[in-house]
Amino acid sequence: MILSHHGLAGLWTLGCQGAAFLAAAELNASGGVLGEEIELVEIDSGDTQASAFAAARRLALEENVDAVIGLQSSDLRPAVRRGLAGLAPYIYTPHYEGGFCGPGTAQLGITDSEVLNPSLEWMVTHRHARRFFFVGNDYIWPRVAHGTTDEAIRNAGGTFVGQALMPFGQRDYETTLAQIRQARPDVVVIAMLGEDSVCFNRAFAEAGFSRRMVRLNLAFDETQLLALADGASENLFAAQSYFDTSRGNDRDALAEKYDACYSGQRPTMTANSVQCYDAIYLVAALAQQVGRVDGCQMAHFLRPRLSRDRAYQMIGRSDADARVRLAEAEGVDFVVRRAFQA
């Protein structure tokens, strides 16, 4: 597993580790993968392309892993793939901008278009939204999400009234908040990574905007919601494939096993946790597909794009697990307002 142990995406690491270890324990209890026991090797990707490349290269050449599961920002994903050099498949788990992530890679996360089109249409219909503003970090995912948001707004009959992209780690939001104040949007779409999203949402509420503007956060989950200050979640929405309050499609049993296994010592199970759990099962399915536990052969199997539908079929789950759920924050929980088929 290659995860960010610190930095903006570090807040997801514990939940992802917990879910992956649970999946590995389940498979090992039932005989492993083609008779071989799963051993999880963890490494920190860091937050630069150089560190992500080095981490992946170490897993492939020194640890001799058969597969890699990763949750990284989109700007680090190519570095991980290059570091693996086709020696092991790369299962990329988070919400991302969409598209093929390259030979040897399988994607399990939902995409911006799957989230934005139905969610913004719902905002227009049910919240009478007409004016939309976009805020994001300045890297590949939000840049692509900006264009996807523009298209989704036009499809929904709304008006795009402004945008702002900020570097990682920026905490001075005065200029961006002034732009939002001047633009007077009904909805602000936020595509920021991990802790950056938490900090911006907090500043947004402190500026008094949350009473009159709706926020739609992309790639935002219960871990981030819990990190917000009291009173900072008014009119805050998020869209994910899973929320802990919206269990179903046999995820109830998974959540119960997760809770029982860790007895509250791990964060609430989130969409990122679930996708890391599924990724372990996908690696097992890839080994079954090629007939042996062999990283090169499994990576070669993924040279053409493997659709998410096909990935779910291989692990014996319905693609209904990838349904998009639009939820509104109520305290430290999300309450689902609408579910859409991805």
Predicted features along the sequence, with ranges:
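Extracytosolic ligand-binding ectodomains
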Residues: 1-342
